[in-house]
Design a protein with these regions (language model features):
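Beta-propeller domains
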Residues: 1-125
């Protein structure tokens, strides 16, 4: 398991009951799936696609009145089609909600970071 993330604003300094990770399945050195892991039992719900290598998951919390925990975003390299896409998953079920193919292939990267346009300081929110 690599790149573990939690809902930082809701769990900072407190116990949490789930985390999201990228993990390798089989002999691959690169992550081949994204997983929602419940703590402490280690039960995992996953998303994967043949020939696809997801990057670091980014958790986006849903509004308080939503029926889901939020969304999980990841930039994915599809080695079979030589394309890169952004996948949006339901963070509760790990079902794919949306996908946006980028106009050009991005090399596989280790971390994905997002910055507010008016604040270059990294935000965990």
């Amino acid at each position: 398991m690599e790149f573990p993330v939690v809902d930082y604003p809701a769990t900072l300094g407190r116990a949490y009951d789930r985390l999201y990770v990228a993990e390798a399945d089989g002999p691959s050195a690169l992550p081949t799936r994204l997983a929602r892991v419940t703590v402490p039992d280690g039960e995992a719900t996953t998303w994967s696609e043949p020939g696809a290598f997801p990057g670091e998951p980014i958790f986006v919390r849903a509004p308080a009145d939503a029926d889901t925990e939020g969304a999980l975003l990841s930039v994915v390299l599809d080695a079979e089609s030589d394309e890169t896409f952004l996948v949006v998953l339901d963070a509760t079920t790990m079902d794919e909600l949306a996908r946006a193919t980028l106009p050009h292939r991005l090399p596989y990267g280790f971390h994905g970071q997002f910055y507010a346009a008016d604040d270059p300081v990294r935000s965990m929110a």
